[in-house]
From Swiss-Prot:
Record PANTHER family: SSRA-BINDING PROTEIN, TMRNA-BINDING COMPONENT OF TRANS-TRANSLATION TAGGING COMPLEX
Biased composition (Basic and acidic residues): 133-154
GO CC annotation terms, alphabetical: cytosol
UniProt KW keywords: Cytoplasm, RNA-binding
Family: Belongs to the SmpB family.
NCBIfam families the UniProt entry points to: PRK05422.1, smpB
Molecular functions (GO terms): RNA binding
Native source species: Salinibacter ruber (strain DSM 13855 / M31)
Region of interest (Disordered), residue spans: 129-154
GO biological process, one term: trans-translation
Protein known as: SsrA-binding protein
Keyword RNA-binding: yes
Primary role: Required for rescue of stalled ribosomes mediated by trans-translation. Binds to transfer-messenger RNA (tmRNA), required for stable association of tmRNA with ribosomes. tmRNA and SmpB together mimic tRNA shape, replacing the anticodon stem-loop with SmpB. tmRNA is encoded by the ssrA gene; the 2 termini fold to resemble tRNA(Ala) and it encodes a 'tag peptide', a short internal open reading frame. During trans-translation Ala-aminoacylated tmRNA acts like a tRNA, entering the A-site of stalled ribosomes, displacing the stalled mRNA.
Length: 154
């Protein structure tokens, strides 16, 4: 991330369940109470995904933003679909990629950059169970090698 960014939420499962092929930064349309709640760190990307709708707009589905307590009855709906701000060419390209078999668009992180809410999204291909096991084995081998090297290089 660049300077001036404040990461609010990460989708840790996305790195494990998917192979991320390409990433993109998108703006996020939020209501006032949602911005205040996100600034307090009360947002979750677990189970969220992005999809292009009939009007040609990309929206994020399933993202949870806790209602802001001070908003009272004028607060927001916690799991509403939120519009992503992207160029039409980007929406078209990513929409076509997501229509391919086994591909989806997943949110990777939610952050503020220069005061604006941004969402890092990735085009991802789902992993099979054996792929996940292989990734775990590789990660464990790397950790073990680093540990052994650090023992010899005090």
């Amino acid at each position: 991330m660049a300077e001036g960014t404040e990461v609010v939420a990460r989708n840790k499962k996305a790195q494990f369940e998917y192979d991320i092929e390409e990433t993109l930064e998108a703006g996020l349309v939020l209501e006032g109470s949602e911005v205040k709640s996100v600034r307090q760190g009360k947002a979750s990307l677990d189970g969220a995904y992005c999809q292009v709708d009939r009007e040609g707009e990309m929206k994020i589905h399933g993202m949870y933003i806790k209602p802001y307590e001070e908003a009272g009855p004028f607060g927001h709906e916690p799991r509403r679909n939120r519009k992503l701000l992207l160029h039409d060419q980007q929406i078209g390209k990513w929409g076509q990629m997501a229509e391919q078999e086994g591909y989806t668009i997943v949110p990777l992180s939610l952050y503020f950059r220069d005061g604006w809410a941004k969402l890092k999204i990735g085009i991802a291909k789902g992993r099979q169970k054996h792929d996940k096991r292989q990734a775990i084995k590789e990660r464990e081998m790397e950790r073990r090698l680093e540990r052994e090297q650090s023992d010899y290089n005090f």
